[in-house]
């Protein structure tokens, strides 16, 4: 059984297709940076594992959902999967990995300073860390699953506490993606106009998750129904890795120890 909410994007639900390929594109763009012993923090359903394995010497993944790591262990018996929350990275020795990948995770981490510090600790000298996260400049509504979101400057400043070699890039979309984004924005604004009590702003996260999940799924289904050909035709080829730009959908941080 797969674990799907609108926060854990499906590769099977058609209305999730644009976001699935946006998330998958990060792994495609990461390929040229991947080498040696690789650790993925927050592997989820294993969206990018097949891409990583083609470039890695060994692969270890950590995720807090034990059902996920157990299923991935059966699917990839030669790789190592650990069920654990983080940070800290328990039982991971200093300078253990050549490459670290953590996509769409840091926005969920309460102690993001410790998270970056731990990444620096477990990387080998010359090792690289690749981190993606939503660009708050392009976020349409508050996400109750996220502790925080970042501007590129905020993420750069956070990383610079422990890393000196930092490259900030971002995941950008072509005209098809812009059309989907604009349609999504119009739809979200209609929903927000109905929020006469401003629940988006004031409702605690644990309560806001309930209407957010329902309305987010409804919205994705609506976008799919209104333009099936657009939603289902989007692939990783419609995304690109670009230099830092406030219009990038996601931030893509490259760190070297």
Located regions from the model:
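A short His-aromatic
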Residues: 104-108
